[in-house]
Amino acid sequence: MFQLGKSEKAFEEAKRYMPGGVNSPVRSYRSVGSNPPFISSASGSRIYDIDNNEYIDYVLSWGPMILGHANPEVIASLQEAIPRGTSYGAPTLLETELAKKVQAFMPSMEVIRLVNSGTEATMSALRVARGYTGRDRIVKFVGCYHGHSDALLVKAGSGLATFGVPDSPGVPQGVAENTITLPYNDSDAVRKLFDEIGDTIAAIIVEPVAGNMGCVPPEPGFLETLREVTKAHGALLIFDEVMCGFRASSGGAQKRYNIKPDLTCLGKIVGGGMPLAVFGGAREIMNQIAPAGPIYQAGTLSGNPIAVTSGLATLSILQRDPTIFKQVEDATIALCEGFERLAAQYNVPVVVQRVGSMFTIFFTDKPVKNFDDAASCNEEQFKMFFYHNLSHGIYYAPSPYESNFVSICHKSSEIERTLAVADEAFKKISDTLL
């Protein structure tokens, strides 16, 4: 019988020492109104908690584990690297090798800087954009998350283009007011804004495939519009591919949609599950960063040899066997088509959206194109679906506004088991609609 007694006790103790008992808010399970399982180990497609429950994992550490948990080749590379020392604060050959592999996957990243997190990557990319253009204003889109730096933690009010209002206490109004938010997938709003004040904007930053309001692909022409207006007005286009990089395709969303950004931010998969992110782009722009140029960016643990080893091993496997990208996408297609078939069978309004190997099940009867669409989905039905799956060994993101992911270890048996549990969950929801 499914139970989380040990996890519940562990959570209560954790709350005494950490805010809310966690180190990232979504892990608290507050959005689904419960307590989280505390994880003890993971292997392949499976994750295990301290109550000895086993789950098929579709969170995959929020995306990084495309090779599955504890990939033997990645683990072996770490076991070999750790005895040589865990941090030097000095250049290593590994850094250059990783940069070369990243560039091979994404040629737009001509010069690359290694950092420790996606937040560092986006924060630094914005500083570079502002320093390079000599402008202060940036544009982001409602529902796109780019880390928790002050300039990006803002929300929109009413109107076409809203100058930033802080989305968290502690974010100064003066910092946020240079951030302009627009609706995702709204090309007309972008054009209108740039017609009015385009020559004052340093950059647009965008998730080319939104993943932080659930999986929301770009509408045809949207990314093209961003590229067109930024070029016309001397602003930079920054792709935040922290989530969709290596998920949308082998070369990220920029390859899938054939759009070349000025700067790209990567994380998650690029570190193979370790704290590592990168940002990079055109040589002329990136060479403005110290010590090559005047724009300052630094980090004590940037290029950490253990994290770089993990990333290098992961990218080496993906480079050696590019069929992995098709395999994980095919598995995602099979899974999502199964969800759609079952939901239709039980007359449960569901829209399943996916790009590459990332997906979200939205409990709604219309396609989700922006944050307002996502926010209008049925949260109670999501909770029913989520809890039935969790209690039957299927581990999804504990929020209706998150993406889920598939790894190379999710074989046909895992897909079949997942769909069998989904069948039960959709039937349960259907019974409430009678």
Predicted regions and their residues:
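Conserved N-terminal phosphate-binding loop of PLP-dependent enzymes in the Aspartate aminotransferase
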Residues: 1-434
